[in-house]
């Protein structure tokens, strides 16, 4: 009786139709950016109060191989963690600057991460290997996200 029961279970499992999902293919179709809090200005402490773990500050005057600033108009750049994910926050004077200069440098950062190596990693100014897949423009900041958007959107929504 046990053998028949096990055979039926195996038959049901073998015949069930489960669509295999390839996360790499599906990740390309997901949005890579989000904008919110357009009328607000935030500080590092606002992010810490929202649950972000501050780790270290990066320089704002880093340049690429052509001598162009990587993060033009950035006032501060901080690296830290939220929900065990790498999060970089770039601070600008206001939302207008974060949604132009900040957005442009964020787009370059996520495309650079994808093209950097097989794992998508880039090496930061402190020799950390970090891969950013998406970003949120929130008020006067740009939040670079290690993973896709949900955790970064959650962090930006916790800001007060």
Question: What spans do the regions from the language model cover?
Answer:
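Short, solvent-exposed recognition patches
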Residues: 42-128
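Sec-dependent signal peptide recognition
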Residues: 1-8
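Second-shell loop/turn segments in exported
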Residues: 29-34, 86-91, 140-146
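Acidic/histidine-rich, surface-exposed loop or edge segments in extracytoplasmic proteins
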Residues: 23-28, 83-85, 137
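C-terminal motif of bacterial Sec signal peptides marking the signal peptidase cleavage site
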Residues: 12-14
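A short, solvent-exposed beta-edge/loop patch
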Residues: 117-160
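N-terminal "mature-domain start" segment
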Residues: 18-76, 149-160
């Amino acid at each position: 009786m046990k053998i028949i029961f096990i055979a039926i279970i195996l038959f049901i499992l073998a015949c069930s139709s489960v669509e295999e999902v390839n996360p790499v293919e599906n990740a390309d179709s997901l949005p890579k950016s989000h904008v919110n809090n357009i009328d607000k200005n935030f500080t590092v402490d606002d992010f810490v109060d929202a649950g972000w773990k501050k780790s270290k500050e990066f320089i704002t005057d880093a340049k690429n191989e052509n001598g162009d600033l990587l993060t033009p108009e950035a006032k501060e750049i901080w690296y830290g963690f939220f929900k065990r994910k790498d999060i970089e926050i770039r601070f600008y004077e206001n939302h207008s600057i974060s949604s132009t200069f900040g957005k442009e440098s964020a787009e370059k950062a996520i495309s650079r991460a994808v093209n950097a190596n097989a794992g998508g990693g880039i090496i930061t100014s402190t020799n950390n290997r970090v891969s950013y897949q998406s970003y949120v423009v929130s008020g006067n900041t740009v939040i670079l996200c290690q993973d896709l958007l949900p955790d970064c959107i959650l962090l930006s929504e916790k800001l007060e």
